[in-house]
């Protein structure tokens, strides 16, 4: 289900552009060479329908929109950080690393239980408990 929302060829790259502050359609298109206007439009529309992005009309003639991440979209920054941490460990060279803002020490992904905040390393993925 999650991969249906963010797993296609361009969506993660578009999300990354929005996370780093690119808001304008043409700037996003320029920064992602090879991405056609119609594909970018379709991806932005799908991301808006999924609740990841909002669009704001800033010019009526011709119509131009700026794009911003919703809170749900901003929460995907953790996914990008985890990918960058993985890249630091497994890609040579890796051009990005995730570090503590104050100490500049490398960081790692840690999982905590939601209620007790206990750190855990043993994870399972199971069907969600959906309340009716």
Question: For each of these PLM feature ranges, what is it?
Answer:
Residues 1-35:
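N-terminal helix-turn-helix DNA-binding core of bacterial DNA-binding proteins
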Residues 26-58:
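Canonical helix-turn-helix DNA-binding module
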Residues 58-59, 103:
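Short polar/acidic secondary-structure junctions
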